C-alpha cells in the first residue's frame, strides 16, 4: 500500500512540473544516504544549522524519525513543538529553489518565534537538495524523507514545494501548495493561520 501511495505522489509531482528524475527513480528511501561524506563536508562549510533537539513529548506531528540532511542528529517529528513552518521540497524542483530565499528571509526575521524546518522529500539525490539550499543561502535546519515515508499522513504532498504550519496546540495546517514569492507572503500566511501579528 505504501508503494502505491508513494507512486501516486511521484506521478503527481511529475504532473506539476517536476521531471521524473526529480522524483523516485532509484532505490527505496531506506537505501539513500543523506549523510554521505561529501554532503557532511558541504554542510560543515555552510551556515546550515543543526537539526532541532526534542522539545516536547507530543507536539502533534506523527512519531516519525527522519535523518538530518547532510548529517547530524535524527529528528522525531512528534517531539517538535509549534509554531513551526515546515517546507517540503526537492533539490531539482525549480519552484522550490525559487522559494528558498523567501523562507530564509522569514527564518532570519521571525525564526526566534516561528522556526522553519525543511524536509527534502521523495528525493533520491539529496546531495543536490543540500547544495541547492546552501547556494541560495539557506541556514534553517533540514531533514530528509527520501522514500516518502510521510505520505498518507498530515505532511503528505501532491506537489512540491508544499508548506505546512504546526501550531502551538499541535494542529497541522497547509500554508500553501506551490512556491511562495516573498517574505511578505510567508509572513502573511503564517499570521493568518496563527491569528496573530508577528
Q: PLM features: what roles do these ranges have?
A:
Residues 1-67, 198:
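N-terminal targeting signals for export/organelle localization
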Residues 56, 63-84:
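A short beta-strand-turn-helix
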Residues 75-97, 103, 116:
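Short active-site neighborhood of thiol/selenol oxidoreductases, capturing the structured segment around
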Residues 88-90, 119-122, 145-146, 176-178:
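Active-site-proximal beta-strand/loop segments in catalytic clefts of secreted hydrolases
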